[in-house]
Amino acid sequence: NTGYRVQFNSAIGPYKGGLRLHPSVNLGIIKFLGFEQIFKNSLTGLPIGGGKGGSDFDPKGKSDREVMAFCQSFMTELCKYIGADTDVPAGDIGTGAREIGYMFGQYKRIRGLYEGVLTGKGLSYGGSLARTEATGYGLLYFTEELLKINGKDIKGMTVAVSGAGNVAIYAIQKAQQLGAKVVTASDSTGWVYDPDGIDVAALKEIKEVKRARLTEYKKYRPNSEYHEGRGVWSVKVDLALPCATQNELHLEDAKQLVANGCVAVCEGANMPTTLEATQYLQENGVIFAPGKAANAGGVATSA
């Protein structure tokens, strides 16, 4: 495996940005996410510069032991370049509290320092309360305000969400609390459509406890449908929240959303909408919230 860490500008404070563990990771992707991170960090108003890192290691299907071994060797090299006042990495796709914990332990062992060098830690060793929910909740509060400004109410809206990770789960939860009905979720193998509204408890059980695929969802909700591959944006909804990964919403998807009368698209993931799709949505009067503003809750509430 190859590890990466890209740092942009630390003139006003330490670099800050996630560590992504996913087979698709390469230098290009990390640079592009890091560049986006500069603007996202500046929008939080906090004194932090842009950075991003990760590796093409795939934690999927690996045992705790294997993940731990990887995280430790990754940190053995990474620790030379980071520090509480230099660069503070965080979680991202494939990197949750478990992985951050393994890395933090290794950093502490090598450097002999118990400091704020990583964010997204568990509560028992210095993490911040509500960090897990921050990105998804922040996305919905942002969306709610954005709709209000445009004279619309999120209450009663039908929503499509892509993804089934940290951002997606809590975005779905908060959307339901605000009175909207979320009918989709997706992962790397396929997507589910639940006409009665996604069951967050079932989703958490599948994704956070069992770390399984969404195919399991039908066992919990027999009324739902599971579809292989892409297609989450083909459902007729009022609001679309891409919360999976970069470049997941293409021009064709944007055309489908517009045809189905979608009112707004708000990004939960980093750069999930392609440039052509973004332009098409804006030309057709769809309210569009870029991720660098809409998902910045994750940076702001990270410890």
State each model region's role.
Residues N1-F39, P47, D56-F57, G61:
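Generic N-terminal targeting/processing segments that precede catalytic cores or assembly contacts
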Residues L27, K31-F35, M68-C79, I100-G105, ...:
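Predominant activation on well-ordered alpha-helical scaffold segments within soluble catalytic domains
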Residues F32, T86-A90, L113-L118, V161, ...:
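General beta-strand structural signal in soluble alpha/beta enzymes
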Residues N41-I154:
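Glycine/serine-rich phosphate-binding loop and adjoining beta1-alpha1 elements at the start
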Residues I82-D85, K152-G156, V235-D238, L257-A264, ...:
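Short, surface-exposed connector motifs at secondary-structure boundaries
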Residues T119-G122, G127-K236:
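Glycine-rich phosphate/diphosphate-binding loop of Rossmann-like nucleotide-binding domains
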Residues A244-A303:
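Rossmann-fold NAD(P)-binding glycine/threonine-rich loop
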